Amino acid sequence: MSAGKAQIGKPAPEFQAKAVMPGGEFKDIKLADYRGKYVVFFFYPLDFTFVCPTEIIAFSDRAEEFRKINCELIAASVDSHFCHLAWTNTSRKEGGLGSMKIPLVADTKRTISQDYGVLKEDEGISFRGLFIIDDKGILRQITINDLPVGRSVDETLRLVQAFQHTDKFGEVCPAGWKPGSDTIKPDISKSKEYFSKQKA
């Protein structure tokens, strides 16, 4: 599968852009800065909208859970870094983000959105794209939602854990797999070990 220049199993498109960091400062960040860590890179349409703060706050509030498994979260939209800062300086009760634990990338030229295949050309905003990039910079997962529906932090965390498990042990993860659940050995005879435990 691919989206723009982003292809599963290939290096994720590199980017460099200004971001609002968790402390409120502006910083130029690039994907290469995160090599050696997993990255969940997700796009949202616009600041000061309706579904977007619920998603970003949900991810930010659980950033430590991702960091504990060597994974960083990065959010991006086509808004400027000044707009991002104003949104973080607006209280959550007023539709703002409040204090953030993750960087917000300003894709004002829309090149990152184009490279990742999430740009809604007619409106100049990003669809809700989410990309899981592994510690070697390889793209492992792509999800793109239409504008009205937000994403699940639980499912994103589960997917990162599953990819990390397969990377470490070489086994494959069945539907709904969670840490501690049985995996499948990718071998015709050895896989029967898993399937023999399933209900008839």
Curated annotation (Swiss-Prot):
Which residues act catalytically here? C52 (cysteine sulfenic acid (-soh) intermediate)
What do the Gene Ontology cellular component annotations say? Answer: cytosol
> What GO molecular function terms would the record report?
thioredoxin peroxidase activity
GO biological process annotation, one example = removal of superoxide radicals
Q: Which domain of life is it from?
A: Eukaryota
Q: Which family does it belong to?
A: Belongs to the peroxiredoxin family. AhpC/Prx1 subfamily.
What is the annotated role of this protein in its UniProt record? Thiol-specific peroxidase that catalyzes the reduction of hydrogen peroxide and organic hydroperoxides to water and alcohols, respectively. Plays a role in cell protection against oxidative stress by detoxifying peroxides and as sensor of hydrogen peroxide-mediated signaling events.
- Its name, as the record gives it, is Peroxiredoxin
